[in-house]
Amino acid sequence: MSAIKSIATVLAAILPSVLAQANTSYADYNTEANPDLTPQSVATIDLSFPDCDNGPLSKTIVCDTLTSPYDRAAALISLFTLEELVNATGNTSPGVPRLGLPPYQVWNEALHGLDRAYFTDEGQFSWSTSFPMPILTMSALNRTLINQVASIISTQGRAFSNAGRYGLDVYSPNINSFRHPVWGRGQETPGEDAYCLSSAYAYEYITGIQGGVDPKSLKLVATAKHYAGYDIENWDGHSRLGNDMNITQQDLSEYYTPQFLVAARDAKVRSVMCSYNAVNGVPSCANSFFLQTLLRDTFGFVEDGYISSDCDSAYNVFNPHEYAANVSSAAADSIRAGTDIDCGTTYQYYFDEAVDQNLLSRADIERGVIRLYSNLMRLGYFDGNSSAYRNLTWNDVVTTNSWNISYEVEGTVLLKNDGTLPLSESIRSIALVGPWMNVSTQLQGNYFGPAPYLISPLDAFRDSHLDVNYAFGTNISSNSTDGFSKALSAAKKSDAIIFAGGIDNSLEAETLDRMNITWPGKQLELIDQLSQLGKPLIVLQMGGGQVDSSLLKSNKNVNSLIWGGYPGQSGGQALLDIITGKRAPAGRLVVTQYPAEYATQFPATDMSLRPHGNNPGQTYMWYTGTPVYEFGHGLFYTTFRVSHARAVKIKPTYNIQDLLAQPHPGYIHVEQMPFLNFTVDITNTGKASSDYTAMLFANTTAGPAPYPKKWLVGFDRLPTLGPSTSKLMTIPVTINSMARTDELGNRVLYPGKYELALNNERSVVLPLSLTGKPAVLSKWPLEEQLIPLAKS
């Protein structure tokens, strides 16, 4: 949809709500997954800052930096007429010219780099760093890396903002967990583990974007999305805009919300986005249990933090959810339930009518707009050139650090290797085959802007010491074999073969789920023919979601298999360096690679994690089948010896009541505190230098059945260990990480026998016992709606 370049045109686009309400011809959003946004929602506007030195507000407390951000915002909003107030409730706000308040855009994207920024065609501000997609970043198991990436994105965002090319709020991160492998947006997430990985990613990304934990001066405002129970786009015709997800209290507490708890309570995120879908009959953006009882009252979301709708989801409360009788009622229901700002124009078009019908009051509208502007106060939006971060410029975008971090080889996962990798120095010529070999923007996944450069695998290998024979071979989804002969010819005259394929955003994307998890098109057929040539064969499996690579795993002539995700602007160079041994792989899968039949065994809309009926269980915690590659799988180029650290003594038994009676300075709740440190000695016993990564799992039969196979309680990454060198790795284990979730959604610590085991190989196992009485660590609140539906 083309953007409107004038705020005057934006205002002219607002139709009388009575005429719009009378139109009863609606899109079928039960099947259509892409909302039809109005031009105003996606408009390009002139971004600038208020003048608190000489402007109309300069003598008011709005410009008084000694007054609290909330009071300054409240003073500003008190000056608005009702029309001006309503105009401020959408993502695109025209501002208030008579007060010197410029237009503002809430909707900016920063998933793995800047998107929706106003880029120039060339020169300054024509690009920003494009990092790998989050699922690949999380596979590195490096919390520091996540924070560094977010901090660089935030710095670049502020530099663009200072130049009038970006807002100060970003609709990132996506912290939904990758529950089902067909989901098109799993690539945007930290993987399938909610309690540990998604929560850790949320904390590091949010604090990197915002400039710390609840800093006095915010760098940017992060938005934790999509709250909650959102992980389907259009599977089998089930549109995300109309899905009503049936989720038990147990699964809501255990899987669909713990990352939002960490985002709100620990990272102090300033914004949360409610999702398109309904949960248990109530659309998320009109769900006062979600938005007030759970998020604010239970999770501790900051009082002046604001909740934004997903784009047009306030409208979806009416169509297709039919939770409200009409659009004005949907708007009233959403804001009264706690959705402060509407990404879209439903609030702006229908609030006047809702006020006239006594469906809501001015105070209901003010509450959300004050929260938005309170954050802008914390961002220094009103404070002139002396405010924090206002000095950032294009020079801060063009930094060596951003180049180095964007070359993110750490997440690459070695799935299979018979010793072929790293390539022997005797290999002088290489055949490069496949649809992922000569790519450009495919490297970036989705939600991306212009990058300074895009290095494809073909580019990188052509710049290496190797002689390259390139052939396209076949497309991602093509059923043609026309390119096979050229691919085989290139392979026959080469010392080794690399095939790069898998899936891309033509098959997995926002609004697009897969119906299967097989390798698409004729790719496997071509790989099989290449494998019969008697040459070393390396396969690069690319894309965010997994495909069933069992045939490649079992084929002895496929020597090595690498998962490379969406590796960003330097992706080809990173893959080259892994293959040639300049860098060693140490990433681990943060999802399960299931066999192909998993995708058709049960509906992807079945949100139950535990096995039942045809559902064999979801995620590594509950899946009862045999995966192709397990969650946490990842090989190295070297070998490691892992043993208990002898100097660290760990008690074999802990009393539950004693643990909970401890003082807990620095922690809001005692259960957040580590009660032991799992410390191991890691020795590189091989010949190659390498990082080392580890996941620590717990398991038990304490508490009620059914029991999870295991669950993740911690992870870590050690930087490079040279041959014969050793380092200690310590993974703290918190009290809460050992708890289970009962059917009511309560987190309960049960007495019984437990094990802590390092990695899937269980290379070090620590048995321990908890004694005493079961203890409820946190109680799940009663699920009820606080706000009666609007009647019109």
UniProtKB/Swiss-Prot annotation:
Protein's organism: Aspergillus clavatus (strain ATCC 1007 / CBS 513.65 / DSM 816 / NCTC 3887 / NRRL 1 / QM 1276 / 107)
GO CC annotations, alphabetized: extracellular region
Function: Xylan 1,4-beta-xylosidase involved in the hydrolysis of xylan, a major structural heterogeneous polysaccharide found in plant biomass representing the second most abundant polysaccharide in the biosphere, after cellulose.
An example molecular function term from Gene Ontology annotations: alpha-L-arabinofuranosidase activity
Reactions catalysed: Hydrolysis of (1->4)-beta-D-xylans, to remove successive D-xylose residues from the non-reducing termini
Active site: 310
InterPro entries: BXL, Fn3-like, Glyco_hydro_3_C, Glyco_hydro_3_C_sf, Glyco_hydro_3_N, Glyco_hydro_3_N_sf, Glycoside_hydrolase_SF, Ig-like_fold
Enzyme class, spelled out: hydrolase
EC number(s) per entry: 3.2.1.37
Protein's name according to its UniProt entry: Probable exo-1,4-beta-xylosidase xlnD
Transmembrane segments: none
Pfam families: Fn3-like, Glyco_hydro_3, Glyco_hydro_3_C
